[in-house]
Amino acid sequence: MELPGALQLGELAAAFASVPVFPLFDAAYFIVSVLYLKYEPGAVEMSRKSPFASWLCAMLHCFGSYILADLLLGESPIHYFSNNSSVILATAVWYLIFFCPMNLFYKCVSFLPVKLIFVAMKEVVRVRKIAAGVHHAHHQYHHGWFIMMATGWVKGSGVALMSNFEQLLRGVWRPETNEILHMSFPTKASLYGTVLFTLQQTHWLPVSEANLVFFFTMFMIVCKVFMTATHSHASPFAPVEGFICPVFFGSVSSGHTSHHNQHGHSHEASYQPPPPVKSKEELNEGTRKRKAKKAE
């Protein structure tokens, strides 16, 4: 009974991997991506003042992963924009979400049950893009493991890794939102997923690509749908990382504490703390006193 079950599972995975993503899954991907753009502060006002800048930001949200991957592989960063069907579909989604009368389209797609369906469909596209990125890099660099991982990672992370550049287009600069320093769950999951696909592509992971695509897609769908439904930002990897990271990379607090304890006394005698910086109110008070003395 185990062999027929395995055959049925393999056939299911193969059938799932052969399902085309255009236009339905791509449309869902664009809808969720542009929705997240509209959630950004000032995005609606920007769409009224500068529709072209808003459209550029929307295209980055939809095609940022392709731009980064092409840059990594030395190809034209605007190569994907030759796909007229995808660009027109993404443009139509952007226009409907931002400019549909009475916000009807936005209200429909942001309705939570409908949005959860689109979120699940977006994860299907994300995993396909990771697998395609690793496969594309393997075709050019057969033994370049890190190139495969980097290409698959940027294919799955999308505009998250370009968030600071996208913010500049919106006239916002928030360097503390650097995605590499503070990885969100999709970025981190894309990184772990591209490692698995790289191992599979180099025959170190004894599983077919169709099965890996199927199971990793199911994992991403379950996690993202649950996090979206519960409005949670907690990473499912946090418990494992909390156990492994201190073992391999040490504790941040303990390492820095011991370092300061060893060198703190030697610097204490020679180091003179700078005078406290005066606040704006104190500076204004001093200015008023000097003016009063001059008047006297």
UniProtKB/Swiss-Prot annotation:
A GO cellular-component term linked to this record: nuclear membrane
Outcome reported for the amino acid change (mutating residue 129 to Q): Pore remains closed
Topological domain ranges for the Cytoplasmic compartment: 38-51, 104-107, 163-183, 231-273
GO BP: regulation of release of sequestered calcium ion into cytosol
InterPro entries registered for this protein in UniProt: TRIC_channel
Keyword Nucleus: yes
Binding-site residues, Ca(2+): 74
Family: Belongs to the TMEM38 family.
Subunit structure, as described in the record: Homotrimer; conformation seems to be controled by binding to diacylglycerol (DAG).
Name this polypeptide is given: Trimeric intracellular cation channel type A
Organism annotation: Gallus gallus
